Amino acid sequence: MEIRADEISRIIREQIKDYGKKVTVAETGTVLSVGDGIARIYGLEGALAGELVEFANGVQGLVLNLEEDNVGVAIMGDFQAIREGDTVKRTQQIASVPVGKELLGRVVDPLGKPLDGKGPIAATETRRLEVKAPGIVSRKSVHEPLQTGIKALDALVPVGRGQRELIIGDRQTGKTAVAIDTIINQKGLNVYCIYVAIGQKQSTVAQVVEKLNRYGAMEYTTVVASNASDPAPMQFFAPYAGVAMGEYFRDNKMHALIVYDDLSKQAVAYRQLSLLLRRPPGREAYPGDVFYVHSRLLERAAKLSDEEGAGSLTALPIIETQAGDVSAYIPTNVISITDGQIFLETDLFFAGVRPAINVGLSVSRVGSAAQIKAMKQVAGTMKLELAQYRELAAFAQFGSDLDKATQETLARGARMVELLKQGQYEPMPVEKQVMQIYAATNRDDPKKRGWIRDIPTADVVRWMREFLEFADGKHPNVAKDLASKRELTADIKTALSKAITEFNEVFQPTPGAKV
């Protein structure tokens, strides 16, 4: 075998030409201590606040504390396998999550990783968890209604696109039910929804996902789940991951709704994180910046100006109170940040008034700007009348001799309470709400004072349900005209009055029921 020098030199030249110097340089540190989801790391001198770092076992962490000789890192995953002395490296990336329509119909964790077993998510865009909220110039006042499908809310505590409306109440009063009904009602309205479950049982989240699937709402909804068994950092960052996903729709000329269920648990997770990071505690052991935690989150919900694309992100944060105490630290913080609150009361819930909305304490600071004209026409004085009824009902318990006007007000109020009762998972289109409320509050004829005046109180719920069925069958144009014109014109009033009169002639009250 002949060895040719020129052949060998040619091969060596090719090897030298194709040689690539593949050396990766990473700034590394060492774990000093680890426990309860927090690691202290020595050596990451160039680390940024909010930067992701990677531990030796592949688990990621988020830099929260920058101190003279170490950094405090929140571990975003299982910290049991991390040991003192392990190597940690910087990723030089600020924490971000995948966003886009690819996440619709999926259940993900706060890092955007799928939890539903449907395979990887093919999102092409990512967004940072923490970004600055839109400024004053970028915003527009809230003026479009976001229909919840719940009569008591759309009539008395209206929510607009871009608003922050707090849902507050004790446990087991129907807070999540109000939020889920609102999500279900967005079907066909081009509103994308994000449901953020913070510190909840996995079985509870599974039930919510199952209900959303059953009513066809998962096709436009993303569920961000941080379960009760997840580390505190995951529970703390879940709302920020959800709002980053919602901002994608807001900034791309679309409308989105985000539900935080619930921010009380996020505050508890943040308190745990802060105490483990040795930050000084304040009132109720919460750190001093817990107000800022919620304000910077909720300020990202906005209605953008026409120049910015006119998109919107509406937030429905949920807060759980203890024994109805709305003056506690976290409830008062969030009440002061939001544009109104829906207060759910235990006593009303157990009295069978569901949704258990306390109309006196609930308020929307956007008001009738977030209502269609037809709803303004029929529900204008409803809140005042209900408040008067509650006051009179309290006094009526002590006296039996009531004058006729008082008896009339009490009877009318009792019917109005019945009118506002609504089953779970039964959101109602706004035009049908208007038809029902018109029947109860019509003021065109002062002698009538409502078409259901002579209907027994116990039959009001059945009357409302059967009236809509009757109107759909015999007078379908009334609902169609209301939906298209969005106001009660003289023609619609005439047609609606005719439909109610015809129905009252055929309605059969329950035998023996009191009027």
Swiss-Prot record:
Query: What subcellular locations does the record give?
Result: Cell inner membrane
Bilayer topology annotation? Peripheral membrane protein
Q: Where does ATP bind?
A: G169, D170, R171, Q172, T173, G174, K175, T176
MF terms (GO), sorted A to Z:
ADP binding; ATP binding; proton-transporting ATP synthase activity, rotational mechanism
Record bears the keyword Disulfide bond = no
- The answer to whether the entry has keyword Cell membrane is yes
Which keywords fit this entry according to its UniProt record? ATP synthesis, ATP-binding, Cell inner membrane, Cell membrane, CF(1), Hydrogen ion transport, Ion transport, Membrane, Nucleotide-binding, Translocase, Transport
At the top level, the lineage of the source is Bacteria
| EC number annotated for this UniProt entry | 7.1.2.2
Could you describe the subunit structure of this protein?
F-type ATPases have 2 components, CF(1) - the catalytic core - and CF(0) - the membrane proton channel. CF(1) has five subunits: alpha(3), beta(3), gamma(1), delta(1), epsilon(1). CF(0) has three main subunits: a(1), b(2) and c(9-12). The alpha and beta chains form an alternating ring which encloses part of the gamma chain. CF(1) is attached to CF(0) by a central stalk formed by the gamma and epsilon chains, while a peripheral stalk is formed by the delta and b chains.
The name this protein goes by in its record: ATP synthase subunit alpha
Which gene holds the coding sequence for this protein? atpA
